[in-house]
Structure formats: structure tokens, C-alpha cells
Amino acid sequence: MTIGDNCYFNKGFTLLVHDWVTRVFIYSGREFLPSSGKVTIGNNVSTAYNVTILKGVTIGDNVFIGANSVVTKDIPSNSIAVGIPCRVIMSIDDFHAKREIQCVKEAFDYALSIQQRFKRRPIITDFREEFVLFVDGDSIEQYPEMAELIRFQLGPSYQDYVKHHKALFPSFEDFLNAAGIR
């Protein structure tokens, strides 16, 4: 088995380089036959919960495998793949473009749900992932309560974020106003 760099395997991950069919062979009066195969996982591969990868599979670089998937065949690089059996549903580029649109609506919905559920105005620390929508890279110091979280969330891309990121909304207040929070 080979596993590349920067891989993350979530809870319930199983990797099998063999199967147990040999036991069935033996107890059904058949000859023992080995059953094993190599698994190769590229760089920057992540899985959601309860993913199983079976023998003989190669997964390319920059791949995300969705929850409860069973990978029985090769998955090419730069892919999002899900299902039983696991199959590619879109490229990582297409998924990123889709998320660029969806994340704004989801952030607005989240802001409104805080207001409705807790009967209060959302505060910046409620937004542990959504900060990219309202914190420019060069304005992190304006939000000291978020600085460490932002550094943690961005990991190795932090310096690039600081140098280049321009948020969709000029400020947290502008974000809340766009979400319909007054």
C-alpha cells in the first residue's frame, strides 16, 4: 500500500488490501486461494465518514471521497467521487465553482438561523468557516477574536490568503446586511 502526502482519512475509514473470500473457499470444500492487491492513494486525498477502499484501487491526487462510499475502481486525479460503488461525480474545479455560489447562500441561511433560533444578532465568532466571505487577507488584524482560528483553518495556505484574498463583502457588517440581518 502507498499513501501520498497531505491525506486525511475521516472516522470509519477502512482500507483493505485483501478480502475474506478465502474463508468461504475453505469452509465450502474448495482450495485456499490468496486474494490480495495493492492500493495506491495519491497526494492531497481526503475522505468523509465511513469510506472503504478495496484492494487493487489507485486514487489520484487532489481527490475527495464522499461519505459511506465503497471504492472498488480507480479514481482519477482532481475528482469528487461518491457512492456504492464509488464513482466520479465531478471535477474538483467544477465542485469548487459550485461551492463558490452555494457557500454564500449557506452563510446567509446560517446567519438568519442564529437570529431566529437564539433571538440575537450573529457575532463574528459564530462564523468559523465563513470568514472568507468578509475578512480580506490584509485585514485579519481588524478581527483579533478570529485571527488564531483563521490561521488554523487555512493551515498551509494562510500566507497566500494574507497576501491575496479579497473577501466578497467589505466587512462583517456588510455581510450581515446582505444576509438580511438588521
Regions found by a protein language model. Name each.
Residues D5, D61, S77:
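Short coil/turn segments at beta-strand junctions that form active-site/ligand-binding loops
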Residues M1-T58, I84-P85, S91-D93:
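Flexible, glycine/small-residue-enriched loop-and-beta-strand segment within the central core
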Residues N50-F64, S69-K73:
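Beta-rich strand-turn-strand
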Residues S77, V82, D94:
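Catalytic binding pocket for nucleotide-activated donors in carbohydrate/polymer assembly enzymes
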Residues T47, I65-G66, A81-V82:
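Short, well-structured beta-strand-loop connectors
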Residues C86-R182:
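Terminal amphipathic alpha-helical/low-complexity segments used for targeting or macromolecular assembly
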Residues S69, S77-S79, R87:
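Glycine-centered loop/turn positions within well-structured domains
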Residues H18, D74, K98:
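Residues that scaffold the ATP/ADP-binding catalytic core of kinase and kinase-like folds
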